[in-house]
Amino acid sequence: MARTVPAPRTRRVDRGGDGARASGPAPTLRIVETRVLRGPNYWAREPVVRMLVDLGVLEEYPSDKIPGFNDALIALLPTLEDHACSLGRRGGFITRLRDGTWAGHVAEHIALEFQILAGTDVRHGKTRGAGPVGQYNCIYEYREEQVGLEAGRMAVRLVNYLVAPDDPEFFFDFAPELERLIRIAERQAFGPSTQALIDEAVSRDIPFIRLDRHSLVQFGHGLYQKRIRATMTSLTSAIGVDIASDKSLTNQLLDSAGLPVPRAEVVDTEDAAIAAARRLGFPCVVKPLDGNHGRGVHLDLQSEDAVRAAFSGAVRESRSGDVIVETYVAGNDYRCLVIGGKVAAIAERVPASVTGDAEHTVRQLVEIANSDPRRGIGHEKVLTRIKLDDAAEALVRDQGYGIDDVVPDGTRVKLALTGNMSTGGTSIDRTIEAHPDNVEIAETAAQIVGLDVAGIDFICPDIATPVRETGGAIVEVNAAPGFRMHTHPTEGEPQYVARPVIDLLFPSGSGARIPIIAVTGTNGKTTTVRMVAHILKLMGRRVGMTSTDGIVVDGRLIRKGDMSGPRSAQMVLQNPKVDTAVFEVARGGILREGLGYDRNDVAVVTNVTGDHLGLGGITTIGQLANVKGVVVEAVPRSGTAVLNADDHYVYRMGRHCAGRVVLFSMSTIKGEDGFDRVDGHTSRGGAAFCLETSTEGELIVLRLGSRTMPVLYTHLIPATFGGRARMNVANALAAAAAAWAAGAHLHDIRQGLRTFSTSFFQAPGRLNLLEVGGVRVVIDYCHNVDGMRQLADFVNRMMVEPQTKAGRIGPTKGGTRTGRAIGVLGIPGDRRDDDQREYGAIAAGAFDEIIVREDKNLRGRQPGETAGNVIDGVRTAKGEGAARVARFDKVLEEMSAVRTALRRAVPGDLVVCCVDDAIAVYREAMSAAGQSRGGTAFTDPGELQAPEG
């Protein structure tokens, strides 16, 4: 429905400059809806935010008509100069701004720039009209979801502020707001070690899934998956981690192996710590038994008083309450990173410090050091900001200075005792300088503790000389060591330490991706998905399947309900049993969130018709085809798109496929579009699955270039009811093509199709045929106009006495009907009025009696409104003489309608139930027949749930 735009309101706004006051519009930009599209989607291949905005009166005010707006925006965000926009050159957006562009477009660019300023590299965006006057879809790329969403909200607020900077209601404090966004980005971003591993995996085309808001990440899909948490991996030994977290045990094991370690004792009281220090001798070290990141570590303690003070700090950081007292080893601090038993990098860690200049205080020197753009909060950047906490202030006092004292020129003041990067330390790469003896000691230490990735901390005078000669020791072994000091050393060459970790997880020749077959279209998706999954399962594949009925993994239902969206796809890709994924991809999921993965190896599009028009901003079949076409655009060069040659919109999708195209077609007559398209495609060496007719029946064949290979007669496929269910003939063609593209041989396809039926337990709610006291009952989920057209054709064929020849049933449509066809019909309330009427009109030509019901979810309609539209269609068709229906009425409650139909039916009749709750109808039919419902692959049909439209 079009929105009525109010008359423009103006306000007096002080625009600065020469002091003049100018008339400007009201700040009426507002967000109507926001969607996060996490995979390939209708708007872009990359993850984007779709922000639907309403300009209000700003629709009449492009940027060049708002006094002072452009100059104020550029003054706040001069880096907008880098935006090329549609002009394709630097400064392009500024040109558009000065020429006049609309507020939605401006908000899009501001949202991108805010993210860039927060440290996120994003570039792509676009703004398009959304239909109603003044409403626009602002599409912009994001990396971190919360950052992208907040950037959009801030962009809208900033636009309104710049439109009316004197209005306190719209005040926008730029610097604090940007700082807040930066903090959000810091919290959401991966740490540098995790990000290094992700970057390396992505460079090898290994997909990743973030499993929590921290550092738990899955690399690979299905049975190939591996996990990391920071730098711990799926291969990391739990015992090894336990040993490394117990510093005393680590020390004992290394000492038993003859490796150099300091003498140490574990204590749990202050007095015990002092006694241990006396035995070990001064200077000594006090540290938590199970601490990390250097917290609570006190070095070079020279007296009992120092030990007493250090104990209280160490015990606070100890989870167990135990503390280690050990001999102090003098020297430099080195971290040896061991990956897969080999040293990958060595860094010298330099504790945080500042150097006096005879001008600034210690506090000011720290502020100067923290202004280095390489320093950030936590692991945000390559260096961490130095904190002036109590420990740092105490250390400064120990050196004879106060925190606000001016330090003599050239005097170095330590701010931390350890060289941990997390306390503001710096690093120097020493990888190529390390002596082979020291390298061997580090590798042995990692093997003894039992870690695939380990950080071995050496204290020694020089890593370039053997520690056994110079007097050094291993003071700690770390599980999950940080990579930042190696990938971004303050001095020296960076070491690409993520590479050997990924080599460890995915050795050369190992897989990371499982085949993904994605099926979309208006009708036939669910049955096609089931057919493909059935074929592949018979080949021995462990298939993970999603559909509108649920998620099935290796033949077992693990989640019931409508599971045709991206989150369900993610569930399958995270399942370690699955080696092949077959996904039903619904229109709604693509529009709401995009695909649940980055690409599919096989994309199948069954058809595109006018169902769901008017929903989600999609108003034409062309737009709907673009939505369905997302799966085709997600096909890589090595993949395949399986397209319906009989459908003009689907056939055209082949132009957007990076891989090969396999067609399927029901057309058998030269001159028909589908037949001619297949002819042209195969003449160019392409492949197609199509039909050929002969005296023996209707045959599915594979045409591959000039060759034609027989697959299977359609009447031998149980799901086609002897070839009379033409929709399932089309679905079988699509499934055969998809399975072939996924690596199935023709004999696999034959076996799969010959053993696939539409029984309730193999395909619930999809053309299930039951016998109830001589009455044939069909349960189906026919919910749109094209589906009714196909169902009507099926009913007409089923009501005619079949012709048989050579053991086959012919797909006969003409002839004399036997018995009556009674239909229980319903269409979702969110379909257009005209579609609901057409649905009824088509049904009127196939059924002798029609009972119209409604879904429980009326989708915004009044009770009886949808049924009334269907009845109007039936009545119109009957009035025009285009109907065979003799009786039609409304019974709105679904089960009451089904019971009414079953009561009216007599032996020989066909009752077709187009219902929302297929399980309840099945139970009712079985109850009427007095039959048992047990003895099937499912314990009870209640394990299933009828799909939602």
Identify the role of each PLM range.
Residues 25-27, 31, 37-69, 74, ...:
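ATP-dependent carboxylate-amine ligase
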Residues 2-203, 342-345, 350-364, 391, ...:
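ATP-dependent carboxylate activation and anion-phosphoryl transfer catalytic cores
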Residues 225-387, 436:
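Active-site nucleotide/adenylate-binding loops and adjacent lid/helix of ATP-dependent enzymes
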Residues 201, 457, 546, 584, ...:
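Residue-level signal for inorganic ion chemistry
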Residues 557-678, 716-721, 785-789:
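Flexible active-site lid/hinge loop adjacent to a nucleotide/diphosphate
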Residues 617-625, 629, 639, 659-789, ...:
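Adenine nucleotide phosphate-binding catalytic loops in nucleotide-utilizing enzymes
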Residues 231, 508-557:
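Walker A (P-loop) phosphate-binding motif
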Residues 133, 139-279, 292:
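Conserved N-proximal alpha/beta basic substrate-recognition cap immediately N-terminal to
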